[in-house]
Amino acid sequence: MIDGPYFVLIVAGVLGTGVVAGVFCGFSTFVMRGLAALPPAQGVAAMNAINVSAVTPAFMLVFAGTAVLCAMIAVVTFVLWPDEGKVELLLGSALFLFGSFGLTLVANVPRNDALARVEPGTPEAAAYWPTYVREWTMWNHVRTVASAAAAVVYLLALS
């Protein structure tokens, strides 16, 4: 049975991965749809503003802090090698670290950086905007599913 500080660590992992999944789900289900409905110049400007304002201590604490929690869960699981839940705990950590945090670094952030380099009212921005929305949203769907799946398998480890 998982108990004590290890239990608390895993519950924190469930909460963190679940909160991140919720934020990503909001972007996938309505924020990006709303932005896509705007004229390209407005959509580009709005998304660039969102990307700048998203880098706050609160968001970074939740997002990067959850990645640290998931890494800690993986390390502690390897050290303790519990009789029950080890597969779920390692899978949950991998899902979040690679499917959410890692994917953010290799898929979403580079697209955000590319969007930041275009001037909102230009033909270049108008041409890039539909591609950005499609690709960014697709990768965000993957991050959403990976984060939610991490929360679920962490919960399964506790059951």
Question: At which residue positions do the language-model features occur?
Answer:
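Small-residue hotspots
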Residues: 74, 92-94, 100, 150, ...
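Acidic/histidine-rich alpha-helical segments that form the ligand environment
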Residues: 90-109, 113-117
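Core segments of transmembrane alpha-helices
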Residues: 63-74, 143-151
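Interfacial loop at the N-terminal end of multi-pass membrane proteins
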Residues: 7-8, 19-64, 110-134
